[in-house]
Structures are given as C-alpha cells and as structure tokens.
A protein has these predicted regions:
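Penicillin-binding protein/beta-lactamase superfamily catalytic region
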Residues: 182, 211-214, 222-282, 333-338
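Structured C-terminal helix/loop/strand segments within mature extracytoplasmic catalytic/sensor domains
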Residues: 48-49, 263-359
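A short, well-structured edge-of-sheet supersecondary motif
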Residues: 68-104, 316-317
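Active-site SXXK
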Residues: 99, 111-135, 257, 325
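Short Gly/Pro-enriched turn/cap motifs at secondary-structure boundaries
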Residues: 82-85, 160-162, 212, 304-308, ...
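Active-site-adjacent helix/loop patches that line small-molecule binding or acyl-intermediate pockets
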Residues: 48-66, 70-72, 125-244
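N-terminal secretory signal peptides
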Residues: 1-21, 28-37
Length: 359
C-alpha cells in the first residue's frame, strides 16, 4: 500500500500541563490579555511574544495529552484506504499570524484532505468570478441532511444549496475557469499549494480507492447536470473533485491553510495574498453554516468558531483576524467528524475564550 510521505518538522516538544484559562485570544485580538494593543476581529495583528508562544505550546501539548487516549469513533470504511490509516494518529497545530506553527503529536503525517478541500476551491472560484456567483449558482444554506445526500438535491429541484456538501463542491469545481481537464486540475492544485505554501502531493492510492467507490458522487454529478447546476463536463468535475479530496496534507499544512483565512487572505508564511480580504468573511460564513456537516449548528453553539472537517480525520478552525488551529485523527463520529480533533480544538478554543459570538 502506498504511504504518504512523512515530512520533517522544526522543533517539537512533548506534552502536559494543567487546565486553566489565561489568554483572551479571539474577538478581542490575538492573546489580548498578554498583548492589550491588539483589537478586534480582522484588525492588524501584532507579533506574538515568546511568552505567548510558550503558552500556546503548553495548550497544544495538554490538549494532545488529554485526548490522545480517547477511544470513541471509527475510521471511515466506505473508502478502503481511509479504513487502513492507523487509528492512533493524532496531531494538533496552531498557526500564528507571523508564520509560526506551534504543534504537538503526529503533525507531519500526511493524510487525505477530503472535504476540507472544498473550502479552498470555493476560494478559487470567488477569486476568479467574485462572491455573487456563490449565491447565484451554489447556495449559502445548510441542507439539513448528510454531506453526500441525494435526497437533498431531489427536495430542492437539484439545487446544491451549499458548496461545502458533495453536490455543491462538484458544482464549485465545475465553475473553475479552465481550458481543459489538465488545466482544470492544475489550477486547483496550484491554489491548494498556495494556501499551504507547500507542494501538496496527490496520493494515487487514495485517488484509486476513491475512484473505485465513487458511484454515488457520479450519480450526484449527473443529477446536477440534469438540473442545470453543472458548468463543465459532469464526469470531469466529479473526477477533479475526487482528485482534490485525495491530496495529501499534514496537520501543519492545514493549520497554515486555515491561517491564510485567519490572516485576511494572506498566507502567514509566504506573505502572498491568496484571496481578497472582503471575500474571507463569506468563506467563513459558509464554514459556520455547513463546515461540520449535519452537526455544524452544534459546533457553533458549543465552540463558536468557523470550521471545516473531512472524513480523512482533519479539522481546521479559524479565529478571524487572529489565528488558526488544525487537528487530525482518523476515528470519526456518526456525522463524519474526527472525535479527537473536535475535542482538542474545542478545549483549546475554550481555554483561549475564542468564541466569536462572545464579547
């Protein structure tokens, strides 16, 4: 079986610390208690101090220690490759606005990005065609049904409703301006690489595993075509979508990709603008509505951060204007969200008082 490469990482440490609330890092700015000059969502961000970074390191270490032994959930088994990924893997990473990544656990293990890719192809379409196309052709509402539901299409006259479910994601892929299939894939791959500031590999074993079992998505693609919601060849869009879900990504990569959204569309490492700042809130709104599938409302109620999950075990969350966090562990709950990743992100967000709906 083909293995994802494990990439080298800078200094990493081990885990453990007591639970306590210190920093107020969220709606009042990154680490506001320690850095009172920082203000508000989306404002200019100061460089974290060494003390701030030590505190973040303590938090990711403790979160890893707290939740590494949680045994709930199981790997996705409808995609054979995902069922074979070691269930004990668990990584957490925070990306700061000055380009540092603070991490614990298996953060260099490359896993399948799966549905998290939907966010970044949506960003590409917005960059090419503007945000209005999302409301006009994709939708901005939750389906109220599982992410791969055909019933949702039937109930809404083949309208995909959201770019963050499978139907809407394939429609999103079909909106990428491309001369041919090769150009189509190159644009999507280059866009992902830009958000990660890394060359993200297509894992052929995952791609084959998904292609051999994606009859359901092919049916959805044809339904979209029937309803005039597919804007390129239906099977080309389905195949490109399958490929983007098969990209290998590490927890570090995912934190940086989310950090680009937290940083107003500018990659915190490369300094390159990947998305107009005015479009970022629209992306985050989609994540809030449908980012964790049919438990998205519960996540917003409990945690209060825009987030996106994938059945490969990854979840990213964004504190707008401040920081981002990513976590990975393969065992999923019934909705398709990583159990350990949810616990880790929710606990760290609570420690940092990061709920964007709170004062």
């Amino acid at each position: 079986m083909e293995k994802y490469p494990t990439r080298s990482k800078p200094d990493s440490a081990t885990f453990a610390i007591p639970r306590r609330r210190l920093l107020g890092f969220g709606t009042v700015g990154l680490l506001a208690a320690a850095m009172p000059s920082l203000v508000g969502i989306g404002t200019a961000i100061a460089k974290p101090t060494p003390a701030d970074e030590r505190r973040l390191k303590q938090l990711v270490d403790e979160a890893h220690s707290r939740f590494a032994t949680v045994g709930d959930g199981k790997n996705a088994d409808y995609i054979p490759y995902l069922a074979s990924v070691p269930s004990h893997l668990f990584g957490i990473a925070i990306s700061t606005p000055d380009g540092k990544v603070i991490e614990a656990g298996d953060t260099t293990y490359a896993f399948a990005i799966e549905s998290v890719a939907k966010v970044f192809t949506l960003a590409l379409v917005m960059r090419e065609s503007g945000p209005d196309i999302v409301k006009q052709k994709l939708g901005t509402n939750a389906t109220g049904l599982p992410f791969n539901s055909v019933i949702a299409l039937e109930l809404h006259q083949d309208d995909p409703l959201s770019p963050l479910v499978n139907a809407g994601a394939m429609a999103t892929v079909s909106l990428v301006n491309a001369a041919n299939a090769e150009d189509h894939w190159r644009k999507i791959s280059d866009n992902m690489n830009g958000f990660a500031d890394a060359d993200l590999p297509l894992n052929q074993a995952v791609y084959k595993s998904e292609s051999d079992t994606n009859q359901h998505n092919r049916a959805i693609a044809y339904l979209l075509q029937t309803g005039n919601h597919m804007y390129s060849d239906a099977m080309e869009a389905c195949d490109i979508y399958t490929r983007e879900c098969s990209i290998g990504i590490t927890t570090r990569d995912l934190a940086v990709m989310a950090g680009t959204l937290a940083n107003g569309g500018v990659n915190p490492i490369s300094g390159k603008r990947l998305l107009d700042k005015a479009y970022v809130p629209k992306i985050l709104a989609e994540m809030a509505v449908e980012g964790l599938y049919d438990t998205s409302g519960t996540w917003q109620y409990d945690v209060g951060l825009p987030a996106k999950s994938g059945v490969g075990g990854g979840i990213m969350a964004v504190s707008p204007g401040n920081w981002s966090i990513a976590a990975f562990s393969p065992p999923l709950d019934a909705a398709g969200n990583s159990v350990r990743a949810q616990l880790a992100i929710a606990w760290i967000a609570d420690q940092l008082k990061a709920n964007i709906y709170a004062e």
